[in-house]
Amino acid sequence: LPGIVSGTELWCQGYSEPGAGSDLANVKTKARFDETKNKWVINGQKVWTSLAHESDWCFVVARTDPDSVAHKGLGFFLVSMHQPGVTVRPIEQLTGTSEFNEVFFDDAVADDILGAPGEGWKVAMALLGFERGVSTLGQQMLFQNELDEIVRIAKANGAAKDPVLRQRIAEAHTGLRLMRYNAMRMLSGSDDGSLDKSSL
């Protein structure tokens, strides 16, 4: 959790799949419990995964019961993106940038499962509820990391001495702090009930 809050660890969501889009009821990615490793092992593919190429971890929705149908028999797994069983292929957009990715899991090991096997649908729906309201927090952390890199480069090449650049960096920093505080306000308001779902 400290890495998430500080923005030093970035997460992506492994929901959408080829042929199923964002229809979680048709997830084909499979998870099986490996008794020798005492861990869940993931096999399958996700697509349109935002920022997977920059992420450290992925929330992966996978089918724990191969005989289950629809939203039953799903698990919600925490998977490190830095392991041999994970392959990320950026999808190039018309602009030449790549925000979205294909992600392949080939015997990738999940560090943990949230909830019990079969409760993945419930966990995923709860997460989507938060995401719709406080997604700005993730954006803020990404932008803050980018601004920190700009400051580092400006200090290294001497551009930080330019008063115009310093003013622009200060304005960007102020805007990012406001963005963060607003997201935190929404989070705390959601917890104490002072903000309902429509406010998020």
List each language-model region with its residue ranges:
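Glycine-rich phosphate/pyrophosphate-binding beta-alpha loops
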Residues: 20-21, 47-52, 94-95
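Tryptophan-centric aromatic hotspots in well-structured domains and transmembrane helices
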Residues: 11, 15, 48, 57-59, ...
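Glycine-rich beta->alpha junctions and the first turn(s) of the following alpha-helix
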Residues: 86-182
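A short core secondary-structure module
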Residues: 39-89
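Active-site-adjacent elements of ketosynthase-type condensing enzymes
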Residues: 19-27
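Internal helix-loop-helix
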Residues: 1-2, 6-7, 51-57, 176, ...
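FAD-binding glycine-rich core of flavoenzymes that anchor FAD
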Residues: 1-17, 35-38
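A structural signal for short hydrophobic beta-strand segments in well-ordered beta-sheet cores
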Residues: 29-32
